[in-house]
A protein has these predicted regions:
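Extracytoplasmic gate region of multi-pass secondary transporters
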Residues: 2-59
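Helix-loop junctions at membrane interfaces in 12-TM secondary transporters
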Residues: 89-100
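Interfacial helix-cap and linker-helix signal at transmembrane-aqueous boundaries
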Residues: 33-34, 64-65, 150-158
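A membrane-interface helix-boundary motif in multi-pass transporters
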Residues: 154-169
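Structural signature of the two symmetry-related core transmembrane helices
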Residues: 72-86
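Loop-to-transmembrane helix entry/capping segments in MFS-fold secondary transporters
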Residues: 40-41, 125-135
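Intracellular juxtamembrane helix-capping segments at the cytosolic ends
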Residues: 110-123
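Multi-pass alpha-helical transporter architecture, strongest
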Residues: 168-197
């Protein structure tokens, strides 16, 4: 029970961070890219790239998760997202820029969808709906705070690279949370095996 409680808190943190990122980018990406020197019409196309990346992240991530470890796929997604967001602060060729935005979309939107799959595996059927519902409820706070924090960041008129570095922080925290979940669950499985022996 103690292990389940700690893992639940870590899941809440992961979903919270994922939704901070989903809604911060979904609401403010065009403005961030305008601040980075791109015109508005191009910046709106970036939003399309973000959502296409999210769709591909969910599909490809799901495919990989069925063949490999889901936690490792999630950590790879969120880590890639953090790197992609930091790279956005540099003057990149347009193709690489679109790719980085798509990766950020895969990490935020795709990562959040895969987190639900991970939670579904963790909770037994009699408490699954409660576990997922509570995690998504906590995550909603992230969905509210994400756009507010991003708007506040932009109002500070900081150098644009600071904004993208700040946006990469939720990805890094999500990597740490998912890693801790994976390690705790692995330790529990080993302890159960030891008792069975």
């Amino acid at each position: 029970a103690e292990n389940r409680g700690m893992v639940t808190l870590l899941f809440w943190g992961s979903v919270f961070m994922a939704l901070v990122l989903v809604y911060a980018l979904g609401n403010w990406l065009p403005k961030l890219m305008v601040e980075a020197g791109y015109d508005l019409s191009t910046s709106l196309v970036f939003l399309l790239a973000l959502n296409i990346g999210g769709m591909l992240g969910a599909i490809c991530g799901g495919y990989l998760a069925d063949r490999f470890n889901l936690a490792k796929v999630l950590c790879s997604l969120f880590l890639s997202g953090a790197i992609a967001l930091i790279l956005l602060s540099y003057n990149l060729p347009m193709v690489i820029l679109y790719f980085c935005i798509a990766v950020a979309g895969a990490a935020s939107i795709g990562g959040q969808i895969l987190l639900l799959a991970y939670m579904s595996q963790f909770y037994s059927s009699n408490i699954r709906a409660t576990g997922l519902g509570m995690a998504l409820g906590v995550g909603r706070l992230g969905a509210i705070l994400g756009p507010i924090l991003c708007g506040w960041l932009l109002s500070l008129s900081l150098p644009i690279n600071y904004n993208f570095i700040a946006l990469s922080i939720p990805c890094v925290i999500a990597v740490m949370s998912v890693s801790m979940i994976h390690l705790r669950l692995k330790k529990t499985k080993l302890a159960v095996k030891a008792l069975q022996i």
